[in-house]
């Protein structure tokens, strides 16, 4: 799949997860960006600790790479408790969840990534655990089967998802705290890059950090990945120091332009402009034209381009906006005018 091969993919990689642990912030004071989330969580945590209670169950959602796992670990650290981590697809049977719940200490954090992928049978077991701190499990099979209740210590469930809309209402309603993570601005990302470089022992100028940040698509995970690749370039061709010029040359070599677009992004936009006159074009026709799967366009390529205002979905199909023409230095068609685009957005 194209996502796994992209330098600017927001999804994580196994080796990357290990490397990122060394540069993750451990406290809210070290946490950069997301000011509203940070202030709210500091308040909730302080209140819970003051009462000697576990924090309310917390749902964190937003695009991949924005720090949901990092925030879950910070919550545990600030509460002074341990965190046990798992993910929705791993919890295949009720027994898998029961094993984790029964190993929790009072006020511990249970972190479930991709919580929207929990199976219905596991989710049913989770309801009484969240609400009453009790575990209802079946022992035996057939006529000899019986239900037993196990008391659980008070704990905090922290669920993370990129697709909050896929959560069932009963599960969503059991979270007392719901936090949405937004894309980062260039200033905050630049601070993150500088902090990561300092931890890794890299010499970096402020302008070099900003150059990396502005091409990172508003995502800390991408910013840290680009930093590691720019580090390689700087060590071989830049005397070990990351300046604006070194960062610019490195990222151009890596085919990441000033808007954070790579070859796949540009190919999609140029195909729409050159082969379909800017659209409207159906997603199946577009997929055939660039030899990609439909879901790759919808789940991997489109979201950032739509969020940045380069593509619109209309009732008639996808269209590029005037920003796409300006990005490539092309003349803007008269039908787009000064205001920009077609009559209005829609969902195809």
UniProtKB/Swiss-Prot annotation:
<feature type="binding site">
    <location>
        <position position="23"/>
    </location>
    <ligand>
        <name>ATP</name>
    </ligand>
</feature>
<comment type="function">
    <text>The RuvA-RuvB-RuvC complex processes Holliday junction (HJ) DNA during genetic recombination and DNA repair, while the RuvA-RuvB complex plays an important role in the rescue of blocked DNA replication forks via replication fork reversal (RFR). RuvA specifically binds to HJ cruciform DNA, conferring on it an open structure. The RuvB hexamer acts as an ATP-dependent pump, pulling dsDNA into and through the RuvAB complex. RuvB forms 2 homohexamers on either side of HJ DNA bound by 1 or 2 RuvA tetramers; 4 subunits per hexamer contact DNA at a time.</text>
</comment>
<dbReference type="GO" id="GO:0000400">
    <property type="term" value="F:four-way junction DNA binding"/>
</dbReference>
<feature type="binding site">
    <location>
        <position position="24"/>
    </location>
    <ligand>
        <name>ATP</name>
    </ligand>
</feature>
<dbReference type="GO" id="GO:0005524">
    <property type="term" value="F:ATP binding"/>
</dbReference>
<keyword id="KW-0238">DNA-binding</keyword>
<dbReference type="GO" id="GO:0009378">
    <property type="term" value="F:four-way junction helicase activity"/>
</dbReference>
<keyword id="KW-0547">Nucleotide-binding</keyword>
<comment type="subunit">
    <text>Homohexamer. Forms an RuvA(8)-RuvB(12)-Holliday junction (HJ) complex. HJ DNA is sandwiched between 2 RuvA tetramers; dsDNA enters through RuvA and exits via RuvB. An RuvB hexamer assembles on each DNA strand where it exits the tetramer. Each RuvB hexamer is contacted by two RuvA subunits (via domain III) on 2 adjacent RuvB subunits; this complex drives branch migration. In the full resolvosome a probable DNA-RuvA(4)-RuvB(12)-RuvC(2) complex forms which resolves the HJ.</text>
</comment>
<feature type="binding site">
    <location>
        <position position="184"/>
    </location>
    <ligand>
        <name>ATP</name>
    </ligand>
</feature>
<feature type="binding site">
    <location>
        <position position="294"/>
    </location>
    <ligand>
        <name>DNA</name>
    </ligand>
</feature>
<feature type="binding site">
    <location>
        <position position="70"/>
    </location>
    <ligand>
        <name>ATP</name>
    </ligand>
</feature>
<feature type="region of interest" description="Large ATPase domain (RuvB-L)">
    <location>
        <begin position="4"/>
        <end position="184"/>
    </location>
</feature>
<dbReference type="Pfam" id="PF05491">
    <property type="entry name" value="RuvB_C"/>
</dbReference>
<feature type="binding site">
    <location>
        <position position="69"/>
    </location>
    <ligand>
        <name>ATP</name>
    </ligand>
</feature>
<keyword id="KW-0963">Cytoplasm</keyword>
<keyword id="KW-0233">DNA recombination</keyword>
<dbReference type="InterPro" id="IPR036388">
    <property type="entry name" value="WH-like_DNA-bd_sf"/>
</dbReference>
<dbReference type="Pfam" id="PF17864">
    <property type="entry name" value="AAA_lid_4"/>
</dbReference>
<keyword id="KW-0227">DNA damage</keyword>
<dbReference type="GO" id="GO:0005737">
    <property type="term" value="C:cytoplasm"/>
</dbReference>
<dbReference type="InterPro" id="IPR003593">
    <property type="entry name" value="AAA+_ATPase"/>
</dbReference>
<dbReference type="InterPro" id="IPR008823">
    <property type="entry name" value="RuvB_C"/>
</dbReference>
<comment type="similarity">
    <text>Belongs to the RuvB family.</text>
</comment>
<dbReference type="InterPro" id="IPR041445">
    <property type="entry name" value="AAA_lid_4"/>
</dbReference>
<keyword id="KW-0067">ATP-binding</keyword>
<dbReference type="GO" id="GO:0048476">
    <property type="term" value="C:Holliday junction resolvase complex"/>
</dbReference>
<feature type="binding site">
    <location>
        <position position="174"/>
    </location>
    <ligand>
        <name>ATP</name>
    </ligand>
</feature>
<dbReference type="InterPro" id="IPR027417">
    <property type="entry name" value="P-loop_NTPase"/>
</dbReference>
<dbReference type="InterPro" id="IPR008824">
    <property type="entry name" value="RuvB-like_N"/>
</dbReference>
<dbReference type="GO" id="GO:0006281">
    <property type="term" value="P:DNA repair"/>
</dbReference>
<dbReference type="InterPro" id="IPR004605">
    <property type="entry name" value="DNA_helicase_Holl-junc_RuvB"/>
</dbReference>
<dbReference type="GO" id="GO:0006310">
    <property type="term" value="P:DNA recombination"/>
</dbReference>
<feature type="binding site">
    <location>
        <begin position="131"/>
        <end position="133"/>
    </location>
    <ligand>
        <name>ATP</name>
    </ligand>
</feature>
<feature type="binding site">
    <location>
        <position position="65"/>
    </location>
    <ligand>
        <name>ATP</name>
    </ligand>
</feature>
<feature type="binding site">
    <location>
        <position position="318"/>
    </location>
    <ligand>
        <name>DNA</name>
    </ligand>
</feature>
<feature type="region of interest" description="Small ATPAse domain (RuvB-S)">
    <location>
        <begin position="185"/>
        <end position="255"/>
    </location>
</feature>
<feature type="region of interest" description="Head domain (RuvB-H)">
    <location>
        <begin position="258"/>
        <end position="348"/>
    </location>
</feature>
<keyword id="KW-0378">Hydrolase</keyword>
<dbReference type="InterPro" id="IPR036390">
    <property type="entry name" value="WH_DNA-bd_sf"/>
</dbReference>
<feature type="binding site">
    <location>
        <position position="69"/>
    </location>
    <ligand>
        <name>Mg(2+)</name>
    </ligand>
</feature>
<dbReference type="Pfam" id="PF05496">
    <property type="entry name" value="RuvB_N"/>
</dbReference>
